[in-house]
Amino acid sequence: MPYLLLFALLFALNAPLARAASCPQWSPQQAKAEVAQLRATLARWDEHYHRQGIALVADELYDQSRERLNHLQQCFAVGTSPSPLASARGPVPHPVPHTGVDKLADRQAVARWMAGKSGVWVQPKVDGVAVSLTYQQGRLVQLTSRGDGVNGHDWSRHIPQLDAVTRQLPEALDLHLQGELYLRLSDHVQAKAGSANARGTVAGLLARKQLTGAQGNAIGLFVWGWPHGPEQQAERLAQLARLGFPDSQLYSIAIDTLEDAAHWREHWYRSALPFATDGVILRQSSRPPAERWQAKAPYWIAAWKYPYAQALAEVRDVRFRVGRTGRVTPVLHLLPVTLDDRRITQVSLGSLARWHTLDIRPGDQVAISLAGLTIPRLEQVVHRTVERQAVAAPAPDRYHAHSCWQASEGCDEQFIARLTWLGGKQGLALPRTGPGTWRRLVEAGLVTSMTDWLQLDAERLQQAPGISRLTAAHLLGSFDEARSRPFDQWLRALGVPIGKHLPLTGDWQALASRSAGHWQTVPGIGAKRSRQLVEFFAASEVQAIAAQLAETGIEGFRPPPQRIEQ
């Protein structure tokens, strides 16, 4: 027992340290400012959504921003925010409060929630707007927005236009239902189309004073709650179907295991449905009497949401990658996030101009998606950090097509990119000459120009860290192969600006003497490309490389032999 107590005490003492490790390293002043700014942003989003029906940000980005605020408030003990539903509160009380729903983060959380529970059902989590519906003598007479779960706004003015909603029951019953008004879609596949802004569209329509017939007909209803209905879910669903709500039964499945829940979650995520969804709802068949329901998450219902289509990621650093042609590509290095089971740690911005426009700094929060389900893509800047860190960006004219032909300060990226192209399949196609090899040779000072490597021997190659005797032998074999490559392959390896299918006939002297007009006589070469070719052959750095290759004896670069007069 003493050992168990000691272990428990050590765990308790270390738990806050583990949590603190994921907290930002901010001063108290910055923490207060960052939290205040995030609270203000969320309050503005809430106000627009609940009062005007306007979603200023995607639902999943809102959810992640709310989670981030909760995390920061715990990190820095700066109090809690008002309920996000505070601005949604209206003057009309619900007959029975709308409960909240706990969100289960992963399979392990779902397994814990299901443990010990029986009679569990799974339904799609329809992505719409929650409402209460009141029927008197079988006629729909009251439609109330969820509001804060206790009081909402009266939307009854829209009832005449909601043709897709059951407005008259087959029996003259008085009953109260809870459900989701959703945007009616045709064969909507959530995994492919995402949320399609369905929730925001419906919220915007219902915030209007009046709907047209077409607008009303675009709204459907999914009933998920009958507070005073039969005790067991199967009977509730059967009676709802008889009353004119068949979808509730069609999209409700009794399950026994975690695997069942995972199966239906995946099935509905990738199947065509008449509405957008953002996960599944798990609920027990039996629940407490409606008189005990409260506007908070109960134990008998939970949500298992789908993977985010957009992840909110924090920028750790902004770096600038320089390519072979001098193109500068800003790259955001991120705190790792997961999208569709892929770990994302960086995203390209494409161009220096785009980075200047967006002005992204370390600490900013950005939205990331996957283009084509594989390539990380920046969607937008969601939150900007209060304290703007300086970023050392290269001057727009620092790098270009003829910069960095040699190793020098600030040139490693472009120079190594040139060498990588030279040895790659689009160049000389030299085995075992990837970017890592060239970087080792450059950093060891063994290669400082585009032709130094032709003069290296095994002893000098082994001076570079990571290059063994065997590797050196392989590299020497590759370098020897380069000497026999044809002239046009050497030119393409050096990056001559011409398409790979266009011919390069003649030797160095013949091509270097061509004018722009001469180049334009070649089919497929226009005015712009001809100017680039003239600039390439006239560049002093390229001419120096050609001279070095001529001295080395590479075909096509050697001047023709002088004729001796008799």
Swiss-Prot record:
Keywords: DNA damage, DNA repair, DNA replication, Ligase, NAD
EC number from the UniProt entry: 6.5.1.2
Catalytic machinery residues: 125
InterPro entries in alphabetical order: DNA_ligase (IPR001679), DNA_ligase_B (IPR020923), DNA_ligase_CS (IPR033136), DNAligase_adenylation (IPR013839), DNAligase_N (IPR013840), NA-bd_OB-fold (IPR012340), NAD_dep_DNA_ligaseB (IPR050326), NAD_DNA_ligase_OB (IPR004150)
A Pfam family: DNA_ligase_OB
Domain of life, per lineage: Bacteria
Catalytic activity: NAD(+) + (deoxyribonucleotide)n-3'-hydroxyl + 5'-phospho-(deoxyribonucleotide)m = (deoxyribonucleotide)n+m + AMP + beta-nicotinamide D-nucleotide
SMART domains hit by this protein: LIGANc (SM00532)
An MF annotation (GO) of this entry: DNA ligase (NAD+) activity
Uppermost EC category: ligase
GO BP of this protein: DNA repair; DNA replication
Keyword Ligase tagged: yes
Summary of the function given for this chain in its UniProt record: Catalyzes the formation of phosphodiester linkages between 5'-phosphoryl and 3'-hydroxyl groups in double-stranded DNA using NAD as a coenzyme and as the energy source for the reaction.
Family the entry assigns: Belongs to the NAD-dependent DNA ligase family. LigB subfamily.
Protein name: DNA ligase B
Organism of this sequence: Pseudomonas putida (strain ATCC 700007 / DSM 6899 / JCM 31910 / BCRC 17059 / LMG 24140 / F1)
Gene label: ligB
